[in-house]
């Protein structure tokens, strides 16, 4: 089994794919997460030992948190891969394959957790931490309006399974690179306000990414 992640991968697609891969391996399956050229170093601990660079012969391809073919990773597109089944939480999912879509879930990680339990997988500390990354990042650390009581119950179950949430929360929500700090300062300085100060607009030209030695990862985490 090879699991696909989406373009510009976030915590939900990576955490969900990692947890599903680990769960399938526990069941005796040969499973991998397909490489994605846009993976960033923050996610390395959660993908360690799980990634393959090419499609093994006869592999079944599954997607995690991918809502359309246009979101397939560049690596998957280059290899001509499309999933034969998909797991997702976006109601707009348009993939032309059998799929499990639960739009009432805040994150794909919630669905993967339920699937693994249904399959009889023992949720290990590592699986729990992958799923916690998935759920916490897609809910803004449980601040977004998509957060439900089931989201909290799932997170509680992951903590009970051994997930060490403090370093995860610190990594994804409390840690800023120097490049990101510089960009936030620049954007705050150049922000323009409209509608009696209720709307703020700022522009981030691509040249500033190079000027600040920043990555797309830094840009996606900016909060002003």
Where in the sequence are the language-model features?
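Hydrophobic helix-and-loop "lid/oligomerization" segment in the mid-to-C-terminal part
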Residues: 1-8, 15-44, 53-59, 139-222
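Fold-independent oxyanion-binding glycine-rich loops
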Residues: 6-7, 36-37, 64-67, 87-90, ...
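Divalent metal-coordination and catalytic microenvironments
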Residues: 10, 20, 62, 88, ...
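Short helix/loop capping segments that flank catalytic or ligand/cofactor-binding pockets
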Residues: 12, 71-73, 212
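A glycine- and small-aliphatic-rich helix-loop capping segment at beta-alpha/alpha-beta transitions
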Residues: 23, 77-85, 118, 149-150
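Short glycine/serine/threonine/alanine-rich loop segments
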Residues: 29, 82, 121
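Active-site cofactor/cluster-binding pocket
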Residues: 47-98
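Short alpha-helices
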Residues: 90-154
């Amino acid at each position: 089994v090879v699991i696909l992640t989406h373009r510009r991968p976030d915590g939900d697609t990576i955490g969900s794919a990692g947890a599903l891969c680990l769960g399938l391996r526990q069941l005796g399956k040969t499973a991998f997460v397909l490489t994605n050229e846009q993976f960033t170093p923050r996610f390395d601990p959660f993908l360690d030992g799980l990634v393959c660079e090419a499609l093994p012969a006869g592999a079944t391809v599954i997607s995690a948190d991918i809502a359309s073919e246009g979101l397939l990773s560049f690596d998957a597109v280059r290899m001509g891969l499309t999933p034969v089944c998909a797991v997702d939480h976006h109601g707009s999912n348009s993939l032309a394959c059998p799929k499990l879509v639960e739009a009432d879930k805040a994150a794909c990680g919630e669905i993967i957790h339920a699937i693994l339990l249904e399959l009889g997988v023992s949720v290990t500390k590592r699986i729990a931490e992958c799923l916690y990354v998935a759920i916490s990042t897609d809910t803004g650390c449980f601040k977004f309006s998509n957060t439900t009581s089931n989201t909290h119950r799932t997170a509680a179950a992951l903590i009970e399974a051994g997930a060490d949430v403090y370093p995860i929360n610190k990594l994804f929500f409390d840690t800023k690179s120097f490049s990101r700090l510089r960009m936030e300062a620049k954007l705050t300085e150049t922000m323009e306000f409209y509608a009696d100060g209720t709307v703020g607009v700022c522009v981030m030209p691509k040249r500033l990414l190079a000027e600040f030695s920043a990555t797309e990862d830094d840009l996606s985490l900016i909060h002003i």
